[in-house]
């Protein structure tokens, strides 16, 4: 509907012409006097309208299931999976049964389904709509070209009824007579020689969607009991070795070794089967790049590890008694010849805080992402080796909005709470406040209650109203892709200092830090970058997060050409929700575009994210200290002082320990560091802010 809105009409006028029953809430214009510079008002109006569509009881009724799946890019053109005709098997969105068909990512398939009419029937002139999940790379259903990709057919099993294809929109019209309850229709996706192409991202329970418009009046609803299949990874092509960011001297260390396919999907290990519990054994060579020797770490040059075929290997050893940085390279042998990975730098130091890695923004198949919530957390913990993660499905964006379904919202929350493990793997409940008027924000709750305040509810459809609804809760909000597309942040509403101390400056969408960032967010708007907002007086610390839609939290960039993503580095006293909340409120964070370095910046006694008093003597100077442990040779270091930049050469080093005297910082200024590595890796420290002397004195008094 949005794509067909005439350019000559305003979104409201066009929407009302399509949906005469819809009215905007009274006072809407006064409620929203200023919008995001690229606000998608048509999307907001459509969400409001769809929430109030007057459906008939027969719309969305019926059920469907898969009867056969045939791989067309392998040898025999026979059904590779033939299921029993008759009753569909029990289905669960999170626990797909063994009998669910499984197909490889990006494969060509012919998928045969049966649709059974619901208890109220379908009138003559009623419509069926067929499509795979629209997110992200299934081939589209088309009804015109039998030789083309995605060609789909529908045939009635009963006399006197035919399914007339309507090419504009992949509808089938019921022609001849009405369909009675229980009558069946055979549907084939990929009916021609080209088949249909399966999504490139693996997921359990991928849905073949069927919508029923029982009266042909233009309103339809999705079947709740529809057909599903599992999409599985191809052979592994990349090994990923990840360890903790930081440990204390003498602490135990665990490195995880995972294998993924070319699109970042969790794959299965090759190797020698142990014959026990589906486990395989492999051999790995270990080398030190720099730092303590293998002998000092108690490691051998080659080690044999055993794990389940689809689980990570775990390499365990003990940190040395002295401080320093551990750098290891791990290489597969025999069946894993050609697989290798450098481990992220592991800093050994005695400190009241430690660095942890978090991805605080991502989506599952319950909105516009990939995979079940359960698989999302499995990937975050076992493949990406995150310390903390949040699943932030959209409040009202996707096929079944969670702000309309208490059951779906409860499922997401229950799964998040179930995976939580204090001191090891912290899950933070949340959702995305998906405002097409004022910009998207994800909302995180540092407790076990996570109410959804929807961006299309009149009471909470502005940022200030969202913050008032959250006031008093242990919660934070984060603006993201704030400088450009898909919708920029409306900075007219200044970030609430209590509830929004941080902002996401990098994700799969690009970088919203500044116009001179290495890869700015697409569709960037001049003056709407985060640095512009800081210059205007806002105080925001920096994080990155993936905004993953591919089911790969923590490694969202693996499937992108530039490997662009986002991660949050957080210095916390404890690995639990209260500790993380305190650290984020204090802005003790830094952002990366997916890499895992170690970064600490201070000016005089002020740490990243903190405020420091201005000195009355304008000739006074400050001592800047930067420590950085890189994941690739350092290309350059940018010292960013309000609107000015000083560029330092990186000289290809892996470590940086720099002290530098910088000129007097005036009240209202801020200072942060941006470090660029070979291969495109970028890290940003949170700014340090300069207070007027009087402000600091008043606070002290």
Tell where the protein language model's regions lie, with residue ranges.
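Short, solvent-exposed loop/edge segments of extracellular or virion-exposed proteins
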Residues: 86-88, 240-246, 602-607
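Extended, charged catalytic domains and RNA/DNA-binding interfaces, predominantly
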Residues: 251-252, 256-306, 313-701
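Core sequence-specific DNA-binding domains of diverse transcription factors
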Residues: 25, 31, 38, 42, ...
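Ser/Thr/Pro/Gly-rich, low-complexity intrinsically disordered stalk/linker tracts of secreted
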Residues: 3-238
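Short polar/acidic secondary-structure junctions
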Residues: 120, 177, 246, 629-631
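Short, solvent-exposed loop/linker segments at the N-terminal edge
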Residues: 102-108, 121, 245-251, 611-620
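Short, ordered beta-strand-loop transition motifs
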Residues: 104-107, 157-171, 307-310, 435-436, ...
């Amino acid at each position: 509907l949005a794509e067909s809105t005439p350019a000559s009409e305003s979104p409201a006028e066009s929407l009302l012409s399509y949906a005469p029953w819809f009215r905007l809430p009274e006072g809407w214009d006064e409620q929203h006097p200023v919008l995001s510079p690229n606000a998608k008002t048509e999307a907001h109006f459509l969400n409001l309208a769809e929430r109030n569509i007057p459906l008939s009881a027969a719309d969305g009724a019926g059920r469907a299931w898969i009867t056969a799946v045939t791989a067309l890019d392998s040898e025999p053109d026979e059904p590779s999976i033939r299921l029993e005709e008759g009753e569909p098997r029990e289905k669960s969105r999170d626990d797909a049964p063994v009998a669910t068909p499984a197909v490889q990512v990006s494969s060509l398939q012919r998928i045969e389904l049966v649709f059974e009419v619901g208890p109220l029937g379908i009138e003559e002139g009623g419509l069926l709509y067929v499509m795979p999940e629209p997110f992200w790379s299934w081939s589209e259903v088309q009804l015109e070209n039998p030789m083309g990709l995605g060609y789909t057919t529908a045939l009635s099993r009963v006399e006197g009824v035919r399914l007339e294809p309507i090419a504009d929109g992949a509808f089938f019209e019921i022609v001849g007579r009405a369909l009675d309850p229980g009558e069946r229709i055979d549907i084939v996706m990929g009916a021609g020689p080209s088949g249909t192409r399966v999504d490139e991202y693996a997921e359990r329970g991928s849905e073949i969607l069927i919508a029923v418009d029982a009266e042909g009046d233009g309103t339809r609803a999705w079947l709740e009991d529809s057909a599903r299949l599992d999409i599985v990874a191809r052979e592994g092509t990349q090994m990923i070795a990840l360890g903790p960011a930081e440990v204390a001297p003498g602490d135990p260390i665990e490195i995880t070794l995972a294998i993924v396919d070319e699109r970042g999907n969790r794959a299965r290990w090759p190797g020698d089967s142990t014959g026990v519990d589906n486990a395989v054994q492999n051999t790995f060579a270990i080398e030190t790049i720099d730092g303590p020797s293998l002998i000092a770490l108690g490691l051998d040059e080659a080690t044999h590890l055993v794990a389940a075929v689809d689980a990570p290997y775990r390499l365990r050893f003990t940190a040395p008694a002295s401080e320093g940085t551990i750098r290891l390279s791990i290489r597969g042998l025999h069946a894993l010849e050609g697989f290798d990975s450098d481990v992220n730098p592991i800093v050994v130091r005695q400190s009241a805080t430690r660095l942890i890695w978090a991805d605080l923004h991502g989506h599952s198949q319950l909105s516009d992402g990939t995979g079940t919530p359960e698989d999302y957390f499995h990937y975050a913990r076992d493949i990406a080796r995150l310390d903390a993660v949040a699943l932030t499905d959209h409040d009202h964006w996707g096929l079944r909005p969670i702000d309309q379904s208490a059951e779906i919202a409860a499922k997401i929350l229950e799964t998040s709470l179930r995976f939580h493990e204090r001191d090891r793997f912290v899950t933070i409940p949340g959702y995305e406040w998906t405002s097409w008027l004022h910009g998207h924000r994800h909302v995180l709750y540092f407790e076990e209650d996570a109410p959804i305040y929807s961006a299309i509810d009149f009471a909470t459809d502005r940022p200030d109203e969202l913050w008032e609804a959250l006031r008093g809760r242990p919660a934070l909000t984060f603006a993201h892709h704030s400088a450009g597309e898909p919708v920029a942040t409306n900075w007219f509403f200044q970030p609430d200092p209590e509830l929004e101390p941080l902002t996401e400056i990098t994700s799969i969408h690009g970088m919203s830090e500044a116009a001179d960032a290495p890869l700015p967010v697409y569709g960037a708007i001049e003056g709407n970058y985060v640095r512009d907002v800081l210059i205007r007086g806002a105080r925001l610390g920096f994080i990155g997060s993936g905004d993953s839609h591919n089911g790969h939290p923590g490694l969202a960039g693996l499937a992108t050409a530039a490997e662009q993503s986002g991660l949050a580095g957080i210095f916390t006293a404890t690995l639990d929700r209260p500790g993380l909340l305190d650290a984020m409120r204090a802005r003790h964070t830094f952002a990366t575009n997916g890499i895992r370095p170690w970064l600490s910046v201070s000016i005089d006694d002020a740490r990243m994210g903190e405020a420091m008093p201005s000195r009355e003597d304008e000739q006074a100077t400050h001592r800047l200290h930067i420590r950085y442990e890189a994941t690739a040779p350092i290309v350059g270091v940018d010292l960013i002082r309000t609107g000015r930049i000083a560029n330092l050469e990186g000289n290809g080093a892996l470590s940086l320990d720099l002290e530098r005297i910088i000129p007097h910082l005036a009240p209202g200024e801020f200072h942060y560091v941006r470090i660029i590595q070979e291969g495109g890796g970028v890290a940003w420290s949170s700014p340090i802010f300069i207070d007027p002397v009087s402000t600091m004195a008043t606070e002290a008094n």
